[in-house]
Amino acid sequence: MVGGEDMKNPLKKRLPREFIGDFGKYLVIFLFMIGTIGFVSGFLVADDSMLKAYDESFEKYNVEDGKFETAEELDESTINVLEQEKVKIYANYYVEEDTDCDRDGDIDSTIRIFPERKDVDRVCLMKGEWPEKANEIAIDRMYADNNKVKVGDTIETSGKELKVTGLVALSDYSALFSDNGDMMFDAVKFSVAIMTEEGFETFGDVHLHYSYAWTYNEKPEDDIEAKKMAEDFMK
């Protein structure tokens, strides 16, 4: 009978020899695994950071919980009645104007213009400066990139020449949907923008939309509760 100590294991020599012979193949596999792990880890970290920044933006920019539009401006008494439903109502008017962003004489897009926002749906300035004069405007960054419009350029909106002083992102327009029923957002032919109160008023009320935003006094715990609260408020 042969003892365990005297028994020779052929793998002791075979495995090192095979590893050395196929070293290049194993090195490629090892590097591929390291690269894959690094890529996935980086993606998860970046994704977590983006979600955290997105969630924090709701408080930082006081993003609305919902919006509605009326045919006429609401009077103070109507707003007071609505606010008895434990919400805060904000006027968030805008005008929607035809625009020739390359000034070639043809209308190529529509810009939804808001006056300065300080209380709700605040704006993030990503490049340039805030508008200070009536003929100055800050437009959405994606729209500007897609249409090759830069800070300092001039666009024509409803016959008015407006200087682009900055590129912005509106907190309630994380994607440029002109209508909630749209299936695809359009950052080429549609943009949102900010002007001074004085500049906004130069467009008059021909294309004025009486839009209102609301925020809850007590925030819903989750999306299900938020949906129910919105449905109850809009009844």
Give the ranges of each region predicted by the language model.
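Membrane transport/envelope proteins' first extracytoplasmic loop
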Residues: V2-K235
